Amino acid sequence: MSRVAKAPVVVPAGVDVKINGQVITIKGKNGELTRTLNDAVEVKHADNALTFGPRDGYADGWAQAGTARALLNSMVIGVTEGFTKKLQLVGVGYRAAVKGNVVNLSLGFSHPVDHQLPAGITAECPTQTEIVLKGADKQVIGQVAADLRAYRRPEPYKGKGVRYADEVVRTKEAKKK
């Protein structure tokens, strides 16, 4: 049995936590995040820490409490430090540019690909083949990165495509005659 829920989430100075039933709102310098927790979870805010436990009558109380603890810990980190995700474009002529909140990609198609960024997410291109996504919500950043990667996933023979910066693409050997 995992004991994740037993550890409290420390709330640093400058972070405001509001608990309204099962709706938790966390506000910090990088923005405000809100999440509705499962009914099986009970959250208490005391001594600059959030503690978690199961409610009576729910069989999966501890499991849901561990999930809630991990989600709220990510929210606290997001509103204080923020999250970043880096993508690389590998391939001849593959380019990226950011105009406002739109990422423009040239990925070898007959048309450019424009991807609208959701609110709270910013993108920048240090080089034409790199994209850096920044924001407070870890889940949204991961989803945007997955959406950008899905336009041209790395292919297994040359590794061309959009990949995460820390991703290792397994390449196959070409067919022999």
From Swiss-Prot:
Family matches, as InterPro entries: Ribosomal_uL6-like, Ribosomal_uL6-like_a/b-dom_sf, Ribosomal_uL6_a/b-dom, Ribosomal_uL6_bac-type, Ribosomal_uL6_CS
GO MF entry, a single one: structural constituent of ribosome
Signal peptide feature range: none
GO terms of biological process kind: cytoplasmic translation
Gene3D superfamilies: Ribosomal protein L6, alpha-beta domain
GO cellular component: cytosolic large ribosomal subunit
Disulfide bonds: none
Keywords recorded for this protein, A-Z: Ribonucleoprotein, Ribosomal protein, RNA-binding, rRNA-binding
Pfam families per record: Ribosomal_L6
Family membership: Belongs to the universal ribosomal protein uL6 family.
Subunit description: Part of the 50S ribosomal subunit.
Functional note: This protein binds to the 23S rRNA, and is important in its secondary structure. It is located near the subunit interface in the base of the L7/L12 stalk, and near the tRNA binding site of the peptidyltransferase center.
Protein's name according to its UniProt entry: Large ribosomal subunit protein uL6
Native source species: Salmonella typhimurium (strain LT2 / SGSC1412 / ATCC 700720)
Gene name of the encoded protein: rplF
